[in-house]
Amino acid sequence: MAFWSSEGVKRPRRRAPARHIQVRGHAERARKDRAQELAQDYVEMIAELIASTGEARVTDLARGLGVTHVTANRAVKRLQRQGLVTSQPYRSIFLTGEGRSLAKESRDRHDLVVRFLTALGVPSTVAEADAEGIEHHVSKETLAAFVRHLRKLGP
């Protein structure tokens, strides 16, 4: 494929270097990972609100996650499109079966990371805070290694 230069000369079109394509692919993956991380945080908070107060409202969700009402409302709409929650205007938010599964998986992963960190001697308050960042970026293989290590240590 060719193009005409500003000098009126026909030149071959240069392709993007492979490295550039790899970076673009990495950025896209990072965006998808971040979207998944946010979905996990939101469904986990919704499940906690339902368990503790019997309902999850956008205002409570925003307060719990430290975001604005508008941000929480947009996230709920995104979760609805993903089939993780149901909601009606001015009503509570409910997790679908898929949303409940994701919330449980996220909570279990969080708890495992906290147990592993505390087993290493990290204070529980620090382990809780650190787990929030770590839990979304740990592979299944690493989580399995955490479980094996904790089993070796005993109950």
Enumerate the language-model features and the residues they cover:
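Arg/Lys-rich, alpha-helical DNA-contact motif
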Residues: S106-E141
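Basic, amphipathic "hinge/linker" alpha-helix immediately C-terminal to the N-terminal HTH DNA-binding motif
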Residues: R91-H110
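Short, amphipathic alpha-helical interface elements at domain boundaries
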Residues: G8-R31, Q40-V43
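N-terminal positioning helix adjacent to the helix-turn-helix/winged-helix DNA-binding module
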Residues: L38-D41, R57, E98, R109, ...
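Residues within the alpha-helical elements of helix-turn-helix
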Residues: G64, L102, A119
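Canonical helix-turn-helix DNA-binding module
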Residues: A56-I93
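N-terminal helix-turn-helix DNA-binding core of bacterial DNA-binding proteins
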Residues: R29-V67
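C-terminal regulatory/oligomerization modules of transcriptional regulators
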Residues: M1-R19, A129-P155
